[in-house]
From Swiss-Prot:
Family named by the database record: Belongs to the prokaryotic AdoMetDC family. Type 1 subfamily.
Active site: S61, H66, C81
Cofactor: pyruvate
Protein name: S-adenosylmethionine decarboxylase proenzyme
Residues the UniProt record annotates as site (Cleavage (non-hydrolytic)): E60, S61
GO biological process, one term: spermidine biosynthetic process
Gene, per the UniProt record: speH
Protein function: Catalyzes the decarboxylation of S-adenosylmethionine to S-adenosylmethioninamine (dcAdoMet), the propylamine donor required for the synthesis of the polyamines spermine and spermidine from the diamine putrescine.
PTM: Is synthesized initially as an inactive proenzyme. Formation of the active enzyme involves a self-maturation process in which the active site pyruvoyl group is generated from an internal serine residue via an autocatalytic post-translational modification. Two non-identical subunits are generated from the proenzyme in this reaction, and the pyruvate is formed at the N-terminus of the alpha chain, which is derived from the carboxyl end of the proenzyme.
Length: 123
């Protein structure tokens, strides 16, 4: 297994939290920690008149969020490599933090095809 990719849709969220850049950054940091991932860097951008996009770069991959406060909606991806992290825990935390009334979570195992040749060569 290369890793796990979780796609999270949050509905009925707190619109003020969805438009608070500092809150989004704090939530991404907490999600990284609870997933057992190492946060390397973070970038966020606040749109006018509303909405935020954020990316938490992890040693294990990434967490991204895109918010639409006017629709009380957020789209989140959590992708972690290896089997030492728990991306579902990050998703659960983010759903709670943003006060989602409902959510939809899809999880996928990411893996290389078993039939592919190992391209590592010895000199």
């Amino acid at each position: 297994m290369v890793g796990k990719h979780c796609i999270l849709e949050l509905y009925g969220c707190d619109q003020y939290k969805l438009n608070d850049e500092a809150f989004v950054r704090t939530s991404l940091t907490a999600a990284s920690k609870i997933a057992g991932a190492k946060l390397l860097n973070m970038i966020t951008h606040r749109f006018q008149p509303q909405g935020i996009t954020g990316l938490a770069l992890l040693a294990e991959s990434h967490i991204s969020i895109h918010t639409w406060p006017e629709s009380r909606y957020a789209a989140i991806d959590v992708f972690t490599c290896g089997n030492q992290t728990m991306p579902e825990k990050a998703c659960n935390l983010l759903a709670r933090e943003f006060g989602a009334k409902s959510n939809l979570l899809k999880s996928f195992i990411r893996d290389t095809p078993h039939h592919m040749e190992d391209l590592t060569r010895n000199p």
